[in-house]
Amino acid sequence: MEDQHSAASELGSSAAPTLPPPPPPPPPPTSPPPSLQQRQQEPTETDDAEDTCSSSSSSSASSECFVSPLEDTSSEDSADTVLPSEPRRDEEEQEEDSPDRYMDADVLQRHLLRQSTILRQVLQEAAPGAAAEAAEAPSVAELSRRLEAALFSPATPPRRQENGTCAPDPRLNFYPVFMLPEALATYLLFFHNQKIPVSCRANRPRADAHWRLPSGTPLPDYPTTDEVYKIFEGLGDEEPACANQDLKERDSVLVELKLDNPRLAVVKQCIAVTHFAYPALALPPKVMSTLMQTLLVRRASPLPDEGETPLEDLLVVSDEQLARWMHTSDPKVLEERRKTVTAACMVTVQLHCMHTFLTSREMVRRLGECLHYMFRQGYVKLASKIANMELSNLVSYLGMLHENRLGQHVLHHTLKHEARRDYVRDTIYLYLVYTWQTAMGVWQQCLEDRNLRALETSLARARQSLWTGFDERTIAQDLAAFLFPTKLVETLQRSLPDFASQSMMHAFRSFVLERSGILPAVCNALPSDFVPTVYRECPPPLWAHCYLLRLANFLMYHCDLAEDTSGEGLFECYCRCNLCAPHRCLATNTALLNEVQAINTFELQRPPKPDGTLPPPFKLTPGLWTSAFLRHFVSEDYHSDRILFYEDVSRPPRVEPSACVITHSAILAQLHDIKKAREEFLLTKGHGVYLDPHTGEELNTAAPSTAHHAAPPEEAHPQQHQHQQQPSHRRRHHRSSYADRVRSELHAYGGATGSSRDPVSGGCSARGTHSRDAARRRGSQQRDQRQLRRQFAQYPRGTGGGGGTGHTDEAIQALLHQQQQQQEHQPAQELRRPQRGS
């Protein structure tokens, strides 16, 4: 996380806008800002407060939607800005008549005042020496760095709320710019306009059938020009809808075919396109410029008096030098070598860097996890239900988290079959493009002149070995070792990929289509429709897009997103991928199911401390379980390099599925038995009708209910008849005292555990009296509880399995084992009483 914050800080420091030093207090305007008037001036009467609120609400709506008042914590400086309030009605009438109303409003003043207040607080929170230096010679870079560090990497971490999120900070009240794809367009060349091949996916209606991946399919690989030396960009065996349709006379490369699905048929009828703005996937321009000038062609710099420089004079490696290195003077061999090196520098090295960055084991796992968040799939759906918090609303950018509560993540369930697969595949393709462009943008910004000089020196030293490499693939691998070293790859992988939502990818999709001249509102085209499906039908400049599209198709099947395999009950959150099954799925992990059923059903309390204070108890809460569950990843049963679902494997998993907090199955089994015995005791020994709090069904038999509600003869049930003759106020008192006794007995019966739900208050109508055995059982259980607490004081506190706070599994196991041994020597075991009674 420190690397993420440092990367974010380094990113923002170079891209941050120019911030002036704190300005002096502005001259008094005709009316102060309503936000300052409302916060700094306390009204003396209620009418004044109402006038202030009304004037604040009647101000510019555009300013109120993105500028929020910041509470002024300074003492003297901020007091200078307090201005007396004046009525704003005359000013509003003047603004209505003014043609430049927006510029006459106080939006800019409020914004500058707010930013200066934040910056002043940042300087006050800094060290005294640093603050003095900044006051003497303030620097824009220093102010930007301090402002960014105080906002995004504060020295004191923000306070966390009960649900795990940070408390709202008014200083961060802005819409995150990283949620808009245009924010990345300033880092490098964002688009690459090129003619659309006729062999694109839109003209391949059977591509979805060819893209189906069976079990055992490995990760896709990238090609080279040595392997794919012929490119076909025609329709092939696809049959057009009109037999006499001439492609040369058409003004669009999209051809209406007989096998087109309904979406593609509508797309081809709506638009006529020949070119498309493909998102740029090249390496940073500074790196590519250094590579070209060092290995291939020098930059031409003609003098004013001279003409163009011949190409032979611009070549870095002349024919004579290349002939000496290759030990041959054959022109065909030399020309073929130049083509190989040029292809390796322009195409293959980019594909190798992309393959290295996106297909490592850790990166594939993170991509799968982010896709589970994006599509609310599998274990993320289960964690959201247990924690009662929508985890799919979280989005991030280089470690900066933001909760986007308006992002949608379930609309893909409205699509079926091929339409669903096309949408999911295109969304993952855009997500890979988004991730790669983010990495290239960070790399481009962090490059310095000394880095480029060091790269140029390294390439110049290895020039002969690169030109005399074995083949195109090995040359590209050697080039990637200089351009994209392992340390750089690991640094970028620590901060990427980011959490994203389908709404962000939809905005990205609209952004790409709009730059291509396609209106998304009337045309349901996808950017992946204009990418070829196979390498032999794709020109080399688009091989990177073809590779990402094939990788997106692999990830769709690898994460089990192609179809909806969920069901009802335990299969509501079922997912077949290795991230979920078998260790994070209730249908395949019995221990995890027992642990979920034990949430909020028990509590272990230690004896008081010597000072009389009670230590915090151990209680399995939904938040504790969710935190441990999200970290419950078993790498031994994860297959990142191929599609291998758990249900398709005959052998058992390498690691036995277990719970994530209470890892010992014996503890979970005994907690489950205690809970079950407690419920059976209430159903069999208690009198009356016990209703399920969720469904309202009767949990016990109907005989006791009928007997209690009927009017039996006096000789058959004298006590009950006598009870019915009691006054109404005594019957109400009797029922309330009975509920209290059952509730107290329920707590005593659980020993060290507490009840998760009170069956009496959850729908119980009880009558009658208790026998003397209930009092004896209650006293016996209370003594056992006190003895258990004294024994529990011998064990130290620790951390529970899975990272949750509480006691260790060994301490819990020892306590429950001692309690079980003591109960085995007692013939009238309390846990078995309900079974004998039933």
Curated annotation (Swiss-Prot):
Compositionally biased spans, kind Low complexity: 52-65, 701-710, 813-829
Molecular function per GO: RNA binding
Induction statement: Expressed in the late phase of the viral replicative cycle.
Skewed-composition ranges (Pro residues): 18-35
Keyword Coiled coil appears in the UniProt entry: no
Entry superkingdom: Viruses
Region (Disordered): 1-102, 693-838
Post-translational modifications: Might be cleaved by the viral protease.
Record-level GO BP terms: intracellular transport of viral protein in host cell; symbiont-mediated suppression of host gene expression; symbiont-mediated suppression of host translation initiation; viral translational shunt
Subunit structure: Monomer. Interacts with hexon protein; this interaction allows chaperoning and trimerization of hexon proteins. Interacts (via N-terminus) with host initiation factor EIF4G (via C-terminus). Interacts (via RRM domain) with viral mRNAs that contain the tripartite leader; this interaction allows ribosome shunting and expression of viral late mRNAs.
Known role: Protein that inhibits host translation while promoting late viral translation by ribosome shunting. Blocks host cap-dependent translation by binding to eIF4G, displacing MKNK1 from cap initiation complexes and preventing EIF4E phosphorylation. Binds to the tripartite leader sequence of viral late mRNAs and recruits host eIF4G, PABPC1/poly-A binding protein and 40S ribosomes subunits on viral mRNAs, allowing ribosome shunting and efficient translation of late viral mRNAs even though conventional translation via ribosome scanning from the cap has been shut off in the host cell.
Protein family according to the UniProt entry: Belongs to the adenoviridae shutoff protein family.
Protein's UniProt name: Shutoff protein
Organism for this UniProt entry: Porcine adenovirus A serotype 3
Gene designation: L4
